[in-house]
Amino acid sequence: TVGFLDYSEDVKSKDIVSAAKEGYDSSELAKRFTTSGMGPAQGKFENVNAMAILAQATNRDVQSTGTTVWRPPYAPISLGALAGRVFEPERVSPIQRWHHEHGAKDMVAGQWIRPEHYGNPAAEVVNVRSNVGIIDLTPLGKLDLHGPDVVKLLNLVYTNNWDNLAVGSVRYGVMCAEDGVVMDDGVTGRLGDDHYLMTTTSSGAGAVWDWLEMWLQTVHPDWQVTVTPLTTAFCSMNIAGPNSRELLSRVTDIDLDPKTFGYMKVRTGTVAGVANCIVWRIGFTGELSYEIHVPASYGLHVWQRLLEAGQDLGIAPFGIEAQRILRLEKGHLIVGQDTDGLTQAYQAGLGGLVKLGKDDFSGKPELVVQETMAGDHSHLVAVETVNPNLVPPEASQIVRNGNEIVGRITSSRMSPTLKRSICLAHVPAALAAPGSRVTIVLENGDRVDAIVREDLAFVDPEGVRLRG
């Protein structure tokens, strides 16, 4: 008896014979002596042959030799039959009950249960553009940074420069892994000389905290920085729309004059009678907006007070779906949707935030290489389908020369503001120039044409609204 018996465990027929000679002449002992049947197949492929060889080596028949105990599954089954519920903590905002009482449809966003919409996402978008909307942002990751070396840490983990951020200002930043791949983004505000508040993506809060601690504990243990996670310590909300300043002025003692509290600024004060609230002026939706962080136990109170104060201003809540449409209209990317595990900063259109002139930072060597490519890489661009009523599914492939896959649609929606289809896509450099025509393959195999836009923003590319 010669030849391989169990390819996965590298067992030959002669190994079974050797087992019998050594006294391991029962089916279970021979199995363990040789490891035959202990690989991925768990004996389904080889054990019948193994027992036949053992029977021959011990001068018995197969029936009296017996077989090993079969391990489940006995017969092939689909992985779907084995898949169970993902056991993760379900986290909710302090305002969750209010959302349910007012018709919110839930969606799962990482570990969080969040309002997807309140019945009509398109109407929610229109209301934000025309009046004022309010959204629950509690899942937004929040990290408190204290210490004289915070700026060193920010310069290390972000691609842009943090040396000149003044107290009372906030700055958008992008984090890259050491291979230059975009791993998270967010806004960090300077609350005091050595005091900063960092926000991250909702799904990236834990990973960013780990990332900061990794650098502090393994590379720079001498730096004086204390990082405290505050995601659930604050209830966060954003009011957005042309009436948002008037609304906030009715419930706060903070001076909202745009000359003193301009775009990308932060202030601390009282909101709806609650002290020590942090308010910063940023614009993910593309509208004049204020992001408010209040102690979690007061979240529902502040939320309801804002709704009461804004009744004559047309205030209404909006959910994640409306927010995604609004940000797409503005051309703002979402890390993890408009990027993937290979997207580097320049490919995501974030080259303006990469400051290669500063000291070493995470991802710098790889980004230096990409910068020398002079744009010869994939690009994130805005595209419009020739048919304004056709919304290509996200992840639809972009092809050229027949069937060569060269890109994909990363985000797509029907814009209630523009009343047409709008998309973001990754395309090669040859197709990234404004006016380029690209071919999108739909799920049914149909092909449609789209045109690359000059600007990522479909609405207010000059930023007049959010800076108003």
What are these regions (language model features)?
Residues Q96, H100, R114, G192-G468:
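Conserved, structured C-terminal
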Residues I16-K21, G141-D144, G189, Y290-E291, ...:
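Short, well-ordered beta-strand elements within core beta-sheets of diverse protein domains
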Residues L5, E9-S13, G23, G39, ...:
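Generic structural signal for well-ordered, non-membrane alpha-helical segments
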